[in-house]
């Protein structure tokens, strides 16, 4: 048989954090930055609703969800687009803006899907160097050419946990050419409580050359339902709607997201839990000479440079005990580091107890 020829991509496929380990039960997955507290009780109630019309197509425009987003975040309904996870928003932006001769700038250590979607449409990905794992505005500006169309930044950044301040983001937008679209990923903004931080949406909701993307996969706990959203100028959102799949966000995801937005108590509890537990984990690890970033999201980047064991050794030892962390060598190319998701109180205690036992 002859297989018709298809395009060949010179890309490294995204590798999600492991979920299973052969022959081991009671696994703790601390590799994917998922919600430590699960989902809101309001969401659970929706998921138990037997009247869901799953035989019918969902609202393709996600009107009710967009209205709820508009209400909660005080932004224009017409400037909102919903996607099957924020991944799909990233994909649509790349499809809309990039062609093979174009360039997109992404920080050296950043969410892998920025580069993957850009490469799929044939654009050249240009990496800006980071300083001490922090995005550098000067390094981004150095990489700008006439071919630059997009700049992607996650703030706080995944997997490093560092962030740009309010003043730094404003400075970056001023220094970039006006015809370059700045895409700010607010995936972890709910966890960030530093006074010098401001979310991309709060800073640029009325700008014509900024698109902000957000997700329901992290603090809202809807990772499996795949729902995210973007906010930008009406012209850009209208153009994205032309290439958006007609029923891209399913009915259950839309209804769950609406209820998740309404539950302030769950969000507040999640933030408090994260700060308390992350600091507890940091303090325990410091005694083992494992350093990490300050708490800016629901994960920590663990640094083993001063530790008597390597990151790879600890990764394998923990895995043999049923605890999965994220290696930063795969895809990110960050040596001797591990990314740790902040889990439930019980999960974090087991992690601390297990890693202490490895050292003893």
Swiss-Prot record:
- N6-(pyridoxal phosphate)lysine: residues carrying this PTM: 218
GO molecular function of the protein, one example?
Answer: pyridoxal phosphate binding
EC nos: 2.6.1.9
Keyword Glycoprotein in record: no
Which reactions are catalysed by this chain? L-histidinol phosphate + 2-oxoglutarate = 3-(imidazol-4-yl)-2-oxopropyl phosphate + L-glutamate
Task: Specify whether Repeat is a keyword of the entry.
Answer: no
The pathway is: Amino-acid biosynthesis; L-histidine biosynthesis; L-histidine from 5-phospho-alpha-D-ribose 1-diphosphate: step 7/9
Subunit note: Homodimer.
What the record says about family reads: Belongs to the class-II pyridoxal-phosphate-dependent aminotransferase family. Histidinol-phosphate aminotransferase subfamily.
For this protein, the record's HAMAP family field holds: HisC_aminotrans_2 (MF_01023)
Q: What is this protein called?
A: Histidinol-phosphate aminotransferase
| Provenance organism | Pelagibacter ubique (strain HTCC1062)
């Amino acid at each position: 048989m002859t297989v018709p020829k298809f395009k060949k991509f010179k890309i490294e496929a995204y590798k999600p954090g492991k979920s299973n380990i052969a022959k081991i039960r009671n696994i703790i997955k601390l590799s994917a930055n998922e919600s430590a507290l699960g989902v809101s009780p309001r969401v659970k109630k929706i998921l138990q609703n037997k009247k869901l019309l799953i035989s019918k197509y969902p609202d393709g425009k996600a009107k009710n969800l967009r209205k709820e987003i508009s209400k909660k975040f005080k932004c224009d309904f017409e400037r909102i687009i919903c996607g099957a996870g924020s991944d799909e928003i990233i994909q649509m932006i790349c499809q809309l803006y990039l062609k093979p001769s174009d360039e997109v700038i992404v920080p050296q250590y950043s969410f892998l899907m920025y580069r993957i979607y850009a490469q799929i449409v044939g654009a050249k990905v240009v990496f800006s160097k980071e300083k001490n794992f922090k995005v550098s505005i000067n390094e981004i500006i150095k990489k700008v050419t006439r071919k630059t169309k997009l700049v992607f930044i996650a703030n706080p950044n995944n997997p490093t946990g560092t962030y740009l301040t309010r003043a730094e983001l404003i400075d970056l937008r001023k220094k970039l050419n006006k015809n370059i679209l700045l895409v700010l990923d607010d995936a972890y903004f709910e966890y960030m409580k530093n006074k010098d931080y401001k979310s991309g949406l709060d800073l640029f909701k009325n700008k014509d050359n900024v698109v902000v993307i957000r997700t329901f996969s992290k603090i809202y706990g809807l990772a499996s339902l795949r729902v995210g959203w973007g906010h930008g100028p009406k012209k850009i959102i209208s153009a994205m709607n032309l290439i958006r799949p007609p029923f891209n966000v399913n009915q259950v995801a839309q209804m769950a997201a609406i209820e998740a937005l309404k539950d302030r108590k769950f969000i507040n509890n999640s933030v408090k839990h994260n700060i308390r537990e992350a600091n507890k984990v940091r303090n325990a690890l410091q005694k083992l000479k494992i350093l990490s970033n300050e708490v800016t999201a629901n994960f920590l980047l663990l640094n083993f440079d001063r530790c008597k064991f390597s990151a790879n050794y600890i990764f394998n030892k923990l895995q043999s005990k049923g605890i999965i962390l994220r290696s930063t060598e795969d895809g990110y190319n960050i040596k001797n580091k591990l990314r740790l998701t902040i889990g439930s109180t019980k999960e974090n205690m087991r992690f601390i107890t297990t890693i202490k036992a490895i050292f003893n």
